[in-house]
Amino acid sequence: MKVLISSLLLLLPLMLMSMVSSSLNPGVARGHRDRGQASRRWLQEGGQECECKDWFLRAPRRKFMTVSGLPKKQCPCDHFKGNVKKTRHQRHHRKPNKHSRACQQFLKQCQLRSFALPL
């Protein structure tokens, strides 16, 4: 009985990881590419990889806090647009802008990494 439970616990993370990787289907549609692609592109263009733990410790106002020894490149969630008046077309479109999507993807990757660390 204990062996069965322990084997199921070992298989659970593998199943979760396969489900996550299979849900990222890059060939679905033009606007629905691989979710990690935006962050990878950001890193390839010279963006410094952000530390997830540093981001979650930041102030709620989202002011950029530099970590000593690191260059002052900003993470996807560091800068955001203030209150910009929306046009009539934008008001009815609920799709978030590219920046907030990049921020959401970054935070999602941080959460996935935090789940993978204890294993």
Curated annotation (Swiss-Prot):
<feature type="disulfide bond">
    <location>
        <begin position="75"/>
        <end position="103"/>
    </location>
</feature>
<keyword id="KW-0165">Cleavage on pair of basic residues</keyword>
<feature type="compositionally biased region" description="Basic residues">
    <location>
        <begin position="82"/>
        <end position="100"/>
    </location>
</feature>
<dbReference type="GO" id="GO:0090026">
    <property type="term" value="P:positive regulation of monocyte chemotaxis"/>
</dbReference>
<keyword id="KW-0964">Secreted</keyword>
<keyword id="KW-1015">Disulfide bond</keyword>
<dbReference type="GO" id="GO:0005615">
    <property type="term" value="C:extracellular space"/>
</dbReference>
<keyword id="KW-0732">Signal</keyword>
<keyword id="KW-0037">Angiogenesis</keyword>
<dbReference type="GO" id="GO:0048246">
    <property type="term" value="P:macrophage chemotaxis"/>
</dbReference>
<dbReference type="GO" id="GO:0001525">
    <property type="term" value="P:angiogenesis"/>
</dbReference>
<dbReference type="GO" id="GO:0010575">
    <property type="term" value="P:positive regulation of vascular endothelial growth factor production"/>
</dbReference>
<comment type="function">
    <text>Chemokine that acts as a chemoattractant for monocytes, macrophages and dendritic cells. Plays a role in angiogenesis and possibly in the development of tumors. Acts as an anti-inflammatory in the stomach. May play a role in the innate defense against infections. Activates the C-X-C chemokine receptor GPR35 to induce a rapid and transient rise in the level of intracellular calcium ions.</text>
</comment>
<dbReference type="InterPro" id="IPR029183">
    <property type="entry name" value="CXCL17"/>
</dbReference>
<dbReference type="GO" id="GO:0070374">
    <property type="term" value="P:positive regulation of ERK1 and ERK2 cascade"/>
</dbReference>
<protein>
    <recommendedName>
        <fullName>C-X-C motif chemokine 17</fullName>
    </recommendedName>
</protein>
<dbReference type="GO" id="GO:0050728">
    <property type="term" value="P:negative regulation of inflammatory response"/>
</dbReference>
<dbReference type="GO" id="GO:0030154">
    <property type="term" value="P:cell differentiation"/>
</dbReference>
<feature type="site" description="Cleavage">
    <location>
        <begin position="63"/>
        <end position="64"/>
    </location>
</feature>
<keyword id="KW-0221">Differentiation</keyword>
<dbReference type="Pfam" id="PF15211">
    <property type="entry name" value="CXCL17"/>
</dbReference>
<keyword id="KW-0145">Chemotaxis</keyword>
<feature type="signal peptide">
    <location>
        <begin position="1"/>
        <end position="21"/>
    </location>
</feature>
<comment type="similarity">
    <text>Belongs to the intercrine alpha (chemokine CxC) family.</text>
</comment>
<feature type="disulfide bond">
    <location>
        <begin position="77"/>
        <end position="110"/>
    </location>
</feature>
<dbReference type="GO" id="GO:0010759">
    <property type="term" value="P:positive regulation of macrophage chemotaxis"/>
</dbReference>
<keyword id="KW-0217">Developmental protein</keyword>
<feature type="region of interest" description="Disordered">
    <location>
        <begin position="81"/>
        <end position="100"/>
    </location>
</feature>
